């Protein structure tokens, strides 16, 4: 059972903030190796020099802007700096040059399970370095120490209507955390621009620590009748374990779910900077809004049906397919259902991607996880996902209206949560929201360290476009 932060008679969400002194002498992973903040501090001068070198080429051309870019949501425009990851249309995502398989091999794992820790991924995203096991254990403990939410946030969540959308609750709670923003207070008092990154870092770590607690409390209130969370934060455990425990999935009997959560959170943490949640966080942060307000904007973007709701839509569609086709279905039955979906004017959820033109490596990582566990591989719902992943691409190619007919990560993630008993599809995006904090918050720290300016693109009306391009 988890180690209590205070008496077990008090609910986690209603605790008053503990001082650092309360934990003096309890850090179990003290090490001579630099912690995350010290590692970042050492990396900043070199990155600032790199920025100077890039600025020396300010008059060079990066690419062209076509009408289709301006009308098509700015797709394909190289218009923002994003350090943690690069997305290639054919190779998929790379984190500081490392593939997902590289990260699974190199990044430290939890005390149980075999999957990489999301906090190790955050370390990599922020510093470009692979942390040692001791460095990650120390960082995990720091996140656990800072996981409790202020009493007023807990009361606010308790007072929300139980059927208020989880993402609305999530965004409001994160936004309200700016009451304790170190950056906002330091900026108001006067702060050297070169030092903006430090209170921003502190806020980002505080927010990362609290995201699982907020998300778990929303789940408890909406789907489990409210009251205290099933477990309090265990100072000796990692970020994902504590999230799982607060969702009611702690202990040795739930190790597979805890490992799935580690993989899911690490995979969904960053996917370049142009997606809505990442870009919204960067955009709002560029006005020097604190990390809490900035990421609240990212969460509200994530709540949009075109961004963060795909996993639940896939699951609903798969279950509808399962009910519509025979119990002993054939590949032709699946093929026919796919065509019926397309011919009715709907899309096949979980297929295609704004950038990728090959199968999503994140999808493949989750499928590999499932294939290695017979209890998932034999799940009829999962088997239908696997069958679709082989049949749907050929159907979509024949249909001819998609640039990428391959499955994306959403094809499998919701189904895996469903397998482990989480059937509340409306909540899936909140889990995504816990994960997505990793990349945008890491970049927000670099935005402050590099002194990147407020985002201010030029807009143009339709008549202006026509006047400019007619006669070309």
Swiss-Prot record:
Metabolic or biological pathway, per its Swiss-Prot or TrEMBL entry: Organic acid metabolism; propanoate degradation
pH effect on activity, per entry: Optimum pH is 8.0-9.0.
Subcellular location: Mitochondrion matrix
Catalyzed reactions: propanoyl-CoA + oxaloacetate + H2O = (2S,3S)-2-methylcitrate + CoA + H(+); oxaloacetate + acetyl-CoA + H2O = citrate + CoA + H(+)
Entry annotated with the keyword RNA-binding: no
Entry's Gene Ontology cellular component terms: mitochondrial matrix
Alphabetical list of Pfam families matching this protein: Citrate_synt
Keyword tags: Acyltransferase, Mitochondrion, Transferase, Transit peptide
Residues reported in the UniProt entry to bind oxaloacetate: 271, 353, 362, 436, 456
Binding site for CoA: 75, 193, 306, 348, 350-351, 402-403, 408
Span of chain positions assigned to the transit peptide in the UniProt entry: 1-29
GO molecular function term, any single one: citrate (Si)-synthase activity
Active site: 307, 353, 410
SUPFAM superfamilies, per the entry: Citrate synthase
E.C. numbers: 2.3.3.5, 2.3.3.16
Comment on activity versus temperature: Optimum temperature is 49-54 degrees Celsius.
Example GO BP: tricarboxylic acid cycle
Keyword Transmembrane recorded: no
Family under the similarity heading: Belongs to the citrate synthase family.
PANTHER family linked to this entry: CITRATE SYNTHASE (PTHR11739), CITRATE SYNTHASE 3, MITOCHONDRIAL (PTHR11739:SF15)
Record's subunit section: Homodimer.
Reported function: Component of the methylcitrate cycle that catalyzes the synthesis of (2S,3S)-2-methylcitrate from propionyl-CoA and oxaloacetate. Plays an important role in detoxification of propionyl-CoA, an inhibitor of both primary and secondary metabolism. Also has citrate synthase activity using as substrates acetyl-CoA and oxaloacetate.
Protein name: 2-methylcitrate synthase, mitochondrial
